[in-house]
Amino acid sequence: MDSRVLFLLACAFGTGEVLAQDVTFHTHVAPIVYNHCTSCHREGEIGPMPFTTYAEVASYGEFIEYVTSIGYMPPWSPDADYSHFVGENVLSEPELQTLSNWVSAGKPEGDPAANSGFPDFPSGSQIGEPDHVLSMPAAYPHSGDMTEQYQVFVLPTDWDGATSIRALEVQPGNHNVAHHAILGLDISGTAAQLDGADPALGYESFGGFGFNAESSFFGAWVPGALPVNYPPGIGRVIPEGADVLLQMHYGPTAVPESDLTEVNVFLSDAPIEREVFTAIMGPQHLDAPFVLPPNQVTSFHGTMPVTADVSLLNIAPHSHLIGTSWWVYATSPNNQDTIPLISIPDWDFNWQGYFTFPNMTKIPQGYTLHGEATYDNTAGNPFNPNDPPQWVYYGEETADEMFFVFIDLVLYEDGDEEIALGPAEPLCLADFNGDDIVGVADALILLGDFGCVSLCSADLDDDQAVTVADVLLLLGLYGSNCN
């Protein structure tokens, strides 16, 4: 058998001996860092240090190995063994082992010519020319006092009539401080009143929008995330006179900064046949009153009936600082079928997200949606805002808590399961033979394409060549199920 086959299959079945002996930055480590880290860790982005060159990465090599080995970085909260989402950013076991082997070997640089190249990170919109741009009224000043700041900005629409849209895209003005954003919609004028009562630009609000606007939760942004871009015939409607609400979370900074974030609005190219609605599981769906006693870990279980066949597009659990975990799923009437939706075993308020399923996900009529969340209101919770712990109830403030699951959905139609909601992920790009499993057959196909340049079917990293970097990507996906 060709020695390259032996090499590939040996790695695929877990020996890792070649990687342990010969791993270098340019051949093995750079693709991992560029694929998982550099979207945030580069100049002008939220990462506190850049990881763009050998010298930059090597100087933090041991630190990178540690924070990735414990799952702290990259910051992806959903459990990838439970369900998958668009933009999933999780290091595989072979990738983690490669980083460890590289550090153990003394962080060798290797041949710069073997580097597949720095990614092309687009500036401006990631999905095209917007039809409207909603902007903050002025740049928001961050004083540089090392505080986390949560500010809501009211963006009037002033459009004639209801407006059908296919996408909203948050365009941060200053990635040095823009940590994440939440979008909402207000048709009551309440947000404008809160804004008028606050002398600062916008108004401060930690947990949400400062009033009961949860039913108008409209999306979210975190660094590296692609905006939700609905398929043809599917979209949302912004009522005439509505205000778009932009809650910005600004991370701590030691120097004064300013931010002027914009929201790009993309109108539907065709009439909306199915409007996206947001189903909300909240405290009223719980099995017990939403009260968190001090010095106690408390769990809640909420349920919602599914009254029609629906297709899910996105999901976003939401709690505050005392929350520690989430688990959302659907069950059949006889409890013989469970549809996994999202599991977040280690909830982090600062990295909450609006997670898009790879394909529309059907939940049949008669099923039940379940949401389970745990809250640690003890002194052992380092994020507990109360010292000592206090009785905690539902509310908008930092020391309050919430239980919400936001789910975007449409009424189901035949074939929805085949409709992709994001770009093809490497997970399924590596399924070359189309059997929904990344396995030996796919490894052999990649091997047959090894050395190809330009228009290569096995070019997983899109660098116009099939190289060792593609081998490593496939090994990281080996055994994955693309369903």
Description of each model-found segment:
Residues 1-2:
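N-terminal secretory signal peptides that target proteins for export/translocation
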Residues 5-14:
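Sec-dependent N-terminal signal peptides
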Residues 18-155, 241-247, 477:
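Aromatic- and Gly/Pro-enriched helix-to-coil junctions and flexible linker segments
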Residues 51, 73, 218-221, 430-432, ...:
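Short clusters of hydrophobic/aromatic residues that line enzyme substrate/ligand-binding pockets
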Residues 73-85, 114-311, 316-425:
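Beta-strand-centric surfaces of beta-sandwich/beta-rich domains
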Residues 83, 424-483:
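Cellulosome-associated attachment modules in secreted, modular CAZymes
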